[in-house]
Curated annotation (Swiss-Prot):
There is a cross-link at K205 (Glycyl lysine isopeptide (Lys-Gly) (interchain with G-Cter in SUMO2)). Residues 8-81 form the KRAB domain. It comes from the Eukaryota. GO terms for molecular function: DNA binding; zinc ion binding. May be involved in transcriptional regulation. InterPro entries: KRAB, KRAB_dom_sf, Znf_C2H2_sf, Znf_C2H2_type. It comes from Homo sapiens. Its main location: nucleus. GO terms for biological process: regulation of transcription by RNA polymerase II. GO terms for cellular component: nucleus. This is Zinc finger protein 845. Gene3D superfamilies: 6.10.140.140, Classic Zinc Finger. A zinc finger (C2H2-type) spans 215-237, 243-265, 271-293, 299-321, 327-349, 355-377, 383-405, 411-433, 439-461, 467-489, 495-517, 523-545, 551-573, 579-601, 607-629, 635-657, 663-685, 691-713, 719-741, 747-769, 775-797, 803-825, 831-853, 859-881, 887-909, 915-937, 943-965. It is found in: Nucleus.
Amino acid sequence: MALSQGLLTFRDVAIEFSQEEWKCLDPAQRTLYRDVMLENYRNLVSLDISSKCMMKEFSSTAQGNTEVIHTGTLQRHERHHIGDFCFQEMEKDIHDFEFQWKEDERNSHEAPMTEIKQLTGSTNRHDQRHAGNKPIKDQLGSSFHSHLPELHMFQTEGKIGNQVEKSINSASLVSTSQRISCRPKTHISKNYGNNFLNSSLLTQKQEVHMREKSFQCNESGKAFNYSSVLRKHQIIHLGAKQYKCDVCGKVFNQKRYLACHRRCHTGKKPYKCNDCGKTFSQELTLTCHHRLHTGEKHYKCSECGKTFSRNSALVIHKAIHTGEKSYKCNECGKTFSQTSYLVYHRRLHTGEKPYKCEECDKAFSFKSNLERHRKIHTGEKPYKCNECSRTFSRKSSLTRHRRLHTGEKPYKCNDCGKTFSQMSSLVYHRRLHTGEKPYKCEECDEAFSFKSNLERHRRIHTGEKPYKCNDCGKTFSQTSSLVYHRRLHTGEKPYKCEECDEAFSFKSNLERHRIIHTGEKLYKCNECGKTFSRKSSLTRHCRLHTGEKPYQCNECGKAFRGQSALIYHQAIHGIGKLYKCNDCHQVFSNATTIANHWRIHNEERSYKCNRCGKFFRHRSYLAVHWRTHSGEKPYKCEECDEAFSFKSNLQRHRRIHTGEKPYRCNECGKTFSRKSYLTCHRRLHTGEKPYKCNECGKTFGRNSALIIHKAIHTGEKPYKCNECGKAFSQKSSLTCHLRLHTGEKPYKCEECDKVFSRKSSLEKHRRIHTGEKPYKCKVCDKAFGRDSHLAQHTRIHTGEKPYKCNECGKNFRHNSALVIHKAIHSGEKPYKCNECGKTFRHNSALEIHKAIHTGEKPYKCSECGKVFNRKANLSRHHRLHTGEKPYKCNKCGKVFNQQAHLACHHRIHTGEKPYKCNECGKTFRHNSVLVIHKTIHTGEKPYKCNECGKVFNRKAKLARHHRIHTGKKH
């Protein structure tokens, strides 16, 4: 039995939107609309694909090359040849409509319907027979015309070559009475036939009779299949938008568009999901939502294979692979991969907050934020933890909470290796390394690393305390303060010590308690070196040095260092009620605080050390203290069996074996195993020297250096060498000295195998290989490998000469120069040359002298090839090539290439003549002049002419004499 086909147009399955309604749709809804329309289109075409197919041919006309679309009828038995081709042509036809509509939209911004005239006729391709010549888009119905423009919205915008497709006069070729008649063959598959039987889209007729376009527009001449479509079309010419919204005044050209728009105001959501009961205002949104339940994901990424339920989600995902960010903010230049992201971002600049809460009138920039906020009023918490049954209002909060049970910390800091359970915690943590403080208070310009800290800080200025205790009515500026306060009423103590099982209400109390077990005092005063176990104790102590008094009386303006002192003072003015402790005389403003304070004294009397009589608040404190008497060391290292009294000491020790150095310097990248080492190291960059000597005022970067320095003033040297009797102020100095006797050199360089008796000497030596010069002069930017060299160099700029000769009162920049100078007064020359017996005051002078005998000159000038026996001589020689003169006279500004020349020059200004002749008492500025002068008394003439044997007392006279033999005048 043959199946008959009924009349079906694209209108029967189409969903229509006006341009106004179309603009209200977000990108995801538009993508879904496009997908549904295309799917309906394909379904309709597939039902009649073999009998109606559009094929394009290009033919030359009188007007030039024009694209002509021919439609015809193919026999069912030819379907396997052209099926795919036909469908591709139909899809291309869609794009023709899309581009045409785009141009019309640019030119007129009017109606979404566009007319494209098609030239229809017969073609003999594949020897097909034609039963009619109407284009398939006419066969599908005029509704299809009005929807093709919407399909264009998801095409990439670009320039269209031809603004408007030229119409072709085809009136003579097309008859309005033509019909398309298709009789399908009986060899259709059984399954396909069943689909036809079950489809509600088909009627029991054998032929499809497409309606004539009998309704024509008088203005444009355009014809339509239905009168209703004609009426909608005529609105374009009238320019009328007859349906107006009573709420916002927006007008629409069709009543159903207005009905759809009104749901924005009424909140009506007539489309309900049968699976979860969720409702939607549009059918398209419901269709998209259904895919969440079915799990349908037919959009696949060709790059990574990931699938998506929406095409819009796939488009967004593809931007990850391409890295494309085509949407740019005109305000700040930031780019985005999606236009919606740009829209959201612009609200940061405009301050727009279009989403308002009906309960409290609070406004939000994003709809998602409003939805989360609404749960505060409703109390809805749909997300439940399977472990502890705790509920949450957000799924992300539940995900973060689950990590408390699993211990998962997927976010790792690249700087120190610390891991975090939340990405936000890692972002905040990174600011500790970078020092970034992006949040600034407008009132006082104080900056903060975290936004929450800024918000809490602002309440200082506003005095706002929005968090109230339901038990006692007390208000707080922070929710955390309220949570802590409630524990006073509930007695909850969630923080427990692993060592002694003591519990605490607050984590900070537990942290302070742990210090009892470790004995650690992390907080150190930079002024006097005193250490404290609590930061608050250090803060109070520092006020002794700074003189800061932050607690001020509002009545008289008097300021105090401590809050208790202010409370006690305010009693004079009759402000508040004072509670005084009879044991320590400390005062408190309320009974609760003093009650907590009394426990300290009561507990102090509970636990006493039988050995030394010391009292402790807790038994655990006493247990830790007892180790100082018993020598007990319960914490043992598994690697080397070394034992420790405190767990923290063991943890620090383990880093020796693991090599872990979690503390990194942001300036130079150097890492350290302890935070205290990093703190000391940073002072090299900052130049900070917080430790000051009370005797001479000299400052130091480390407390240990100050202690060593103080021994200079006291003269105390308790450490004595048993070999030679030499005494030292430090034990480490004695240890290093003993290696002179034993010859031990335990520190070896891996580069050159050179060995050293001190580790510091090895570290300094390594810089020769690495070229590292970490110590930089702030005045001239010159860098040095040793801090001592920088200190010596700095004296050139400051003119400081701290080393004074007790004999003549002369000052020197370097101690070595003073030692050399003292030999002048003593006449001592302990260093003797084995070759010639000549003696020298300094070992360096002897080494230089030895080069005369060996002839060795290892230092060569790369410019001229001249060789020198001393590196210093080569450095001075280099300045002849470079012209560098780093030594400047502070009096007249004259510059010199050698420091010795500057020193000699200074004597011109000072009139100093330190070199005196012992024979006649005459004085000289330069030693060389004195040496020449002495030859007058001795008669010595050491300079002999090789030509004639004549002798001279000065080298310059010999040089002049040589010219007589050579004949040179200069």
